[in-house]
Amino acid sequence: EISCSLVGSEMCIRDRVSAGAQLILAECAARGCNFHDLADYAAIQINDTHPSMVIPELIRLLGQRGIEFEEAVEIVTKTCAYTNHTILAEALEKWPRAYLDAVVPQLMPIIEKLDALARTRTEDESLAIIDKDDRVHMAHMDIHFTHSTNGVAALHTEILKNSELHGFYELYPEKFNNKTNGITFRRWLLECDPLLTATLEKHIGSGFRKDAAELEKLLASVSYTHLTLP
């Protein structure tokens, strides 16, 4: 079971993380982009902590292209952003150092250097990437080495700032922001279907553009035959 888990994790990192990072750099090179300005050409969104290994992997790949560690960290920080969807444990992964040593031995030295760099910014042990029990905190790495940390609802973001990630918020207040999750009709209706938008405006006015509750006025036209295209 352990070996299968190791193989599965290694394949995940190779196929999803490393291949993705390599594709980004390959496309960047094909377009004549300067790797030193990667953030001007690419944006990597880390959704929860499952893709967190893209941070050390991208640093490793940039190092192979002759970029020094300190600059690679700066480039990756500008390129990557982190979204936290929930404070539940499955979204705040922690992996034993020994496990990562077995799965990604080439990345552990980079993670250790990132941990050392993070410790120069704060003496708070609870914000370290590698804790006293030799566990690697993926969310901690994400917050330290991305330029943005967002929650997905106003209340959720306030909980992150004032409770669950309060120490990080005190250290990096400028990084924290909210991006409400979900689908907005303003995109799939107003932007994507102007003909339907015009039809609705003909029958119920334009108030629904700012107030979705105005769409309830359509209930007066449920016969379908009453609605006509503009």
State the predicted function of each range.
Residues 9-227:
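A conserved ligand/cofactor-binding region detector
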Residues 1-8, 226-230:
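Single conserved hydrophobic/aromatic residue that forms the stacking wall/gate
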